[in-house]
A protein has these predicted regions:
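Signature of multi-pass transmembrane helix bundles
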Residues: 109-255, 420-429
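Hydrophobic alpha-helical bundle architecture
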Residues: 37-38, 280-293, 303-369, 382-392
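Conserved phosphate/anionic-ligand binding catalytic regions in large, soluble enzymes, centered on
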Residues: 20-36, 258-275, 316-320
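Acidic-glycine-rich active-site phosphate/pyrophosphate-binding loop
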Residues: 1-11, 43-56, 236-255, 288-305, ...
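A structural signal for small-residue-enriched, beta-sheet-centric alpha/beta enzyme cores
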Residues: 2, 21-25, 55-56, 147, ...
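Early transmembrane hairpin of solute transport permeases
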Residues: 31-121, 126-128
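Flexible, glycine/charged-enriched surface loops at secondary-structure junctions
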Residues: 44-48, 88-93, 114-116, 193-197, ...
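N-terminal signal-anchor module of multipass membrane proteins
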Residues: 2, 6-40, 45
Length: 429
């Protein structure tokens, strides 16, 4: 068992990274930043200017905003300015009413919002909100993670500044992890210390159930429950996992006002790290303790990988979260640490390179690809099969294999990221 102080640090890390969110986290982070700037201003903004990193812009362009029936940043910004409460963090607009929505639409119609790309920054996650009213101006900046405020000012007077030299933001700090530590924590920590992770199951399975009541996104989750799909995939654990995972994503990307438990700033990653594990545990008749440990393993694996990948990248986050769920499912199958390492290598060999082209309804398709690969990788590992160091980017050392994955996503795919954003922003030219 890990030492008490190490366990406490990891538990704190999980609490920080696994949090509730309503709607896609990128537009909600923008709404949060605007809400804080409006609070600093102390009155209703007459004008809102927002400067964003390319990755934030990419992830917020085509996704539904909860409770509005609208997509994109303008309505998120308007609602953040008018009804948002920063104390709610990524649930910033959870008190939205029909009246508030109409006011938001009016705010947009009056051309009070200006959205631009922030130039000269290296941060993948950067949001700067500037609110103006009469002769007053307030500024709030979020960087590094979705709720991490690093700068606040009112009328030029700095209230808070946690930025590094030359306006850069100091690197996000966290607990240094490796897969062995993740495994040891998840499998040996007293269960009462980690049972809080069941909240992720409660949130995300409920989101899946609510999603099946409506018609959100591409309805992938619902379609998996229909006769045609059942005839192809059967009434199996596999089909149930895909349905329960994709449906929660359908709802979230479709703008349903349904909270989910996120992971590392992403609701889809939270869904992907939770629902496959929870569904498998139920159908496999695993114990409550086994479920708790599997969910912890899944979420902490995703957090570990995101530490080197970064909050936002050119690599689809569902790849990362699916690696976590594959580890959790492998554990529920009775696998040991070696089996989990093999499952991770199988995942990296299969899914590395899947691009992120923004948050949108079709994310449910990518989630389904990730989750189906997670099940396949876990099954292969339990049969003693895994991709070896003689093949491609896989290394004998599982942590080096993970670093190979994240290096490709963070460094090698930078030009890919630029091209994706260029395509997305010029489709109507």
């Amino acid at each position: 068992m890990l030492e008490t102080n190490i366990r406490e640090q990891i538990i704190s890390l999980i609490h920080h990274q696994v949090v509730p969110a309503v709607g896609c986290t990128e537009p909600m982070a923008v709404a949060l930043c605007v809400a804080r700037a409006a609070e600093l201003l102390g009155s209703k903004p007459e004008k809102v200017r927002v400067l964003l990193s390319a990755n934030i812009l990419k992830n917020a362009m085509g996704v539904g905003i909860p409770g509005t029936g609208m997509i994109g940043l303008p309505i998120a910004i308007a609602l953040g300015a008018l009804i948002g409460k920063s104390e709610y963090q990524l649930e910033v607009i959870k008190e939205l009413t029909p009246k508030g929505l109409e006011e938001g639409k009016k705010f947009i119609g009056e051309n009070r919002i200006d959205i631009k790309l922030k130039e000269g920054i290296t941060e993948k996650l950067y949001i700067e909100a500037i609110c103006e009213a009469e002769e007053h101006q307030s500024v709030a900046i979020i960087s590094c993670s979705h709720t991490n405020f690093v700068y606040e000012s009112v009328d030029g007077k700095v209230c808070m500044d946690k930025r590094g030299p030359s306006g850069s933001v100091a690197a996000c700090k966290g607990v240094d992890l490796n897969l062995q530590t993740v495994w040891e924590f998840a499998t040996t920590t007293p269960v009462e210390e980690i049972e809080f992770i069941l909240e992720a199951k409660r949130y995300n399975i409920r989101a899946a159930a609510e999603a099946l009541k409506g018609n959100y996104g591409h309805c992938l989750g619902k379609i998996m429950d229909r006769p045609l799909s059942r005839g192809i995939f059967g009434n199996s654990i596999y089909s149930h996992i895909i349905s329960k995972t994709a449906s929660a994503c359908d709802a979230r990307m479709g703008g349903a006002l349904i909270p989910v438990m996120s992971n590392s700033g992403s609701g889809n990653q939270g869904i992907c790290a939770t629902n496959p594990v929870a569904v498998f545990a139920k159908e496999n008749e695993n114990t409550r303790e086994e479920l708790i440990r599997a969910l912890t393993l899944s979420h902490l694996t995703a957090i570990y990988i995101k530490q080197s990948l970064g909050a936002l990248s050119a690599l689809c986050g569902c790849v990362v979260a699916s690696i976590g769920s594959s580890c959790g499912i492998t554990y529920l199958m009775g696998g040991d640490y070696v089996n989990v390492c093999h499952a991770v290598k199988n995942m990296i060999a299969n899914l590395t390179g899947m691009i992120c082209d923004g948050a949108k309804p079709s994310c449910s398709l990518k989630i389904s690809s990730g989750v189906s690969t997670a099940i396949l990788s876990a099954t292969l590992s339990m049969e003693g099969k895994h991709v070896t160091a003689a093949e491609g980017i896989i290394d004998d050392d599982v942590d080096k294999s993970i670093l190979n994955l994240t290096s490709i996503g963070k460094e090698a795919m930078c030009n890919t990221d630029d091209m994706v954003l260029n395509i997305m922003t010029h489709k109507c030219d």
